[in-house]
Curated annotation (Swiss-Prot):
Keywords: DNA-directed RNA polymerase, Nucleotidyltransferase, Transcription, Transferase. The N-terminal domain is essential for RNAP assembly and basal transcription, whereas the C-terminal domain is involved in interaction with transcriptional regulators and with upstream promoter elements. The gene is rpoA. SMART domains: RPOLD. It catalyses: RNA(n) + a ribonucleoside 5'-triphosphate = RNA(n+1) + diphosphate. The lineage of its organism: Bacteria, Pseudomonadati, Pseudomonadota, Gammaproteobacteria, Pasteurellales. Homodimer. The RNAP catalytic core consists of 2 alpha, 1 beta, 1 beta' and 1 omega subunit. When a sigma factor is associated with the core the holoenzyme is formed, which can initiate transcription. DNA-dependent RNA polymerase catalyzes the transcription of DNA into RNA using the four ribonucleoside triphosphates as substrates. InterPro entries: DNA-dir_RNA_pol_insert, DNA-dir_RNA_pol_RpoA/D/Rpb3, DNA-dir_RpoA, RBP11-like, RNAP_asu_C, RNApol_insert_sf. Belongs to the RNA polymerase alpha chain family. SUPFAM superfamilies: C-terminal domain of RNA polymerase alpha subunit (SSF47789), Insert subdomain of RNA polymerase alpha subunit (SSF56553), RBP11-like subunits of RNA polymerase (SSF55257). One of its GO terms (biological process) is DNA-templated transcription. GO terms for cellular component: cytoplasm; DNA-directed RNA polymerase complex. This is DNA-directed RNA polymerase subunit alpha.
Amino acid sequence: MQGSVTEFLKPRLVDIEQISSTHAKVILEPLERGFGHTLGNALRRILLSSMPGCAVTEVEIDGVLHEYSSKEGVQEDILEVLLNLKGLAVKVQNKDDVILILNKSGIGPVVAADITHDGNVEIVNPDHVICHLTDENASISMRIRVQRGRGYVPASSRTHTQEERPIGRLLVDACYSPVERIAYNVEAARVEQRTDLDKLVIELETNGALEPEEAIRRAATILAEQLDAFVDLRDVRQPEIKEEKPEFDPILLRPVDDLELTVRSANCLKAETIHYIGDLVQRTEVELLKTPNLGKKSLTEIKDVLASRGLSLGMRLENWPPASIAED
């Protein structure tokens, strides 16, 4: 039995044809007969459904209460603007959740390059058109929330946030995967006298946030890790090693005084026993507006200060508070 296993041919990477910076063709051969479809289909499914990335998930546009409306001076209706925002290709370093700011006025197109962001964010397609302003006096301002995720998550699946979602915050279908198109083809291959072998040709296009070769490499790694459990079934009864829970972002452990809010806002938060930034970001706008003496002006100040640090209200923090805070 062992001898038959060693007789399997080991495939090698024949060629990587770089069609463009976002489009490549990878050729792998020789494969035993049938293995071209086995590997090609597995990689294709992972590339389409399981690749991590960043996508727009929520948008707030000044003067817009819901997606079924229009804005004066903007050529597109709000639904079309949201659709255009879905095409935004973003790279985010060191963070899973960021807020981007867009302010534009005057006639002409509004493009991704008009978005304001910090050094942790890179807009891959800066020429991507978001909307068009049709009047010299027209303007548009929006807050764009970008999150890290995997695959495709429709806005309808996030209905659990509806009760906490304030009026004017628009949910967007999130397409996290940087892979735009994937196809594979199996052709005949030959090694010496053997002519019943496979050659696997994978053609892949991404949105630019991830290089095609890196996408295939990650998909292969995911597949290999999932198959590891089958390599040695004798280990199935060994106790699982619990992974250490990731630590919280240090900024969440800092007191709200570090935000340097006005005295009025700071006193209102302390009255509600909001002592740490981690306590604050878990509150929703609706909850804060119920705080005595805290009005919309103070709420706007809090939102802007959090946004400048890549945070927002309504965040969910598992296992909060940490033991170090709970003991205080």
